């Protein structure tokens, strides 16, 4: 057995006195919006991949979930302007984070247990994506046009952003359309795992050498967002409408799924899986109402309020290669039908600011119907 003197000694020390807040490691990192806007189209995970303690869990070009301190999925939550993004990315490694990074003011990352101060169930951390669709201060006219091309997948992306103050009403509009094909890869870089009893093993070796792309690595998305707000000494009030639609392939290897198909027509089934199209589509609509009223009373300083109505649908589908142009339709004759994840959420809340010169405190009331 293992003897006690064989175990390496670990000494843990702590201080009996409190450390100053400035001396403690800061778990919060704020990334300016320009850092993400000036780079190529990326997922949330890829955008934050260079931060300390943050990495990306890629599952094709469309999916890149952030990993914070080794934790991901439901332990890391994505927030949209302070509210939890109610997609289904936490239910599967191949589910996309349904967020729009085309018009980002800043990205806030909180690592570790400190994230519990902002939302529950996030021991890993949170990523808060902040935009200015509901402006809290008067804005000036700004126009941005973006164009992007990628040779590795014959892809392109176009975006436009406009904001202005018209008759004391702040308005903003953003639109982005991206389309990226399958990734080109060096010949022979994709290795096929063949079963020992396959008679045509040599034929497949020749085919893999001719393969020049990664099947089901494509990604396409279209996002649209409009917002308007009114500001003054009394506070602000505004609303925004957003829609995101996407289609992305899920890289797949047919042979790995054929090990359980021990029937007489194994070779025919294998050929069908080789040409199988695996992809997911998403469609989300979101309405936000947000505002703040300055009370400036002896007991109550201000009242913030918000309301969000969001509808999200993710559909996973299988299609044969010949029917690739009918990706949004049902495919007859296939043994596996589409799988749909849907989440309709209504969320509302009030935040009462009871702060004064000696004390800073707030009381929050939240309601969620999911």
What is the meaning of each model-derived region?
Residues 9-37:
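N-terminal periplasmic "start-of-domain" segments of outer-membrane beta-barrel proteins
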Residues 84-111:
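Short acidic/polar hinge/loop motifs at secondary-structure boundaries
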Residues 92, 144-147, 157, 209-214, ...:
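Extracellular loop and loop/strand-boundary signature of outer-membrane beta-barrel proteins
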Residues 45-87:
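Extracytoplasmic beta-strand/coil segments of soluble accessory domains associated
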Residues 231-244, 282-370:
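Face-selective signature of the C-terminal outer-membrane beta-barrel domain
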Residues 140-146, 157, 161-282:
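Periplasmic-side early beta-strands and strand-to-turn transitions of outer-membrane beta-barrels
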Residues 8, 64, 123-125, 141-143, ...:
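Hydrophobic, lipid-facing positions within transmembrane beta-strands of outer-membrane proteins
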Residues 44-47, 64-67, 79, 95-97, ...:
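N-terminal periplasmic accessory domains that precede
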